[in-house]
Regions:
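Amphipathic, non-transmembrane alpha-helical scaffold segments
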Residues: 8, 12, 16, 62, ...
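Short hydrophobic/aromatic patch on the recognition helix
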Residues: 40-51
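Amphipathic alpha-helical segments used for helix-helix packing
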Residues: 93-117
Length: 222
């Protein structure tokens, strides 16, 4: 990479960091390109050399927040419940302003907008992450349970914003435990296992399922 390329990359990252802070903290509609440029100390023309429009900035902002899931060696049940622990820490942050993806969809209001598609994909990514872990447990309906857990996450974010109460994450975690227990998922000696109801057990197989690795949440994005 040449020094020129490095300088351009650094400026692009600086623009994105500033855009992220302003869009998330003040709202996409409330913040114009001129505000972002002034905050950085560059002209609008210079900013447009990196991002040709505000729409491009919006897409880049959400794409940057839509961090792909990563594989973790933590026990699967910890990975699921750990999402709610992460929410608890996020909700307690002074910077918490709700889900950036929900906020963006509400502000933009266009189902066909690229930003809306990014938001939908991000939400589905979390649901699929839950489903993959639950499939490893061998629960009867991993897809349905993954959807229910996702709803708990989404509801916790909305409630925490409205009530200004981080405890919503802990309440959602308790509800998640109820759902998981009902599905036969338990924790035993720090190893996640599943105990199927009698009607679902097979005589030829043990009710205990082997632990399988799954995705872990990244802290900074939601």
């Amino acid at each position: 990479m040449t020094s020129r390329d490095a300088a351009r990359q650094a400026m692009q990252e600086r623009i994105l960091e500033t855009t992220d802070r302003l869009f998330y903290g003040q709202g996409i509609r409330a913040v114009g390109v001129d505000t972002i440029a002034a905050e950085i100390g560059i002209s609008k023309r210079t900013l447009y050399n990196y991002f040709p429009s505000k729409e491009a900035l919006i897409v880049a902002y959400l794409s940057r927040r839509a961090v792909p899931r990563t594989v973790s060696d933590r026990p699967p049940l910890e990975q699921i419940l750990g999402v709610f622990d992460w929410l608890d820490r996020w909700f307690a942050s002074k910077a918490f302003r709700g889900c950036p993806f929900v906020n963006a969809v509400a502000e933009i209001g266009e189902r066909s907008h690229p930003a809306t598609k990014i938001a939908v994909n991000q939400k589905e990514r979390r649901r699929v992450a839950f489903r993959d872990i639950l499939t490893g447990f061998g629960v009867a309906d991993p897809d349905g349970l993954a959807t229910q857990l996702t709803i708990l996450v989404e509801g916790a974010m909305a409630a925490a914003l409205v009530r200004d109460d981080p405890a919503m994450a802990r309440a959602a975690k308790s509800a998640a435990r109820v759902l998981l227990t009902a599905a036969g998922v338990t924790a035993d000696d720090d190893k996640s296992t599943v105990r199927k109801p009698n009607s679902l057990r097979r005589a030829s197989k043990s009710p205990r399922q082997s632990e399988k690795p799954g995705p872990a949440p990244r802290r900074r994005r939601s």
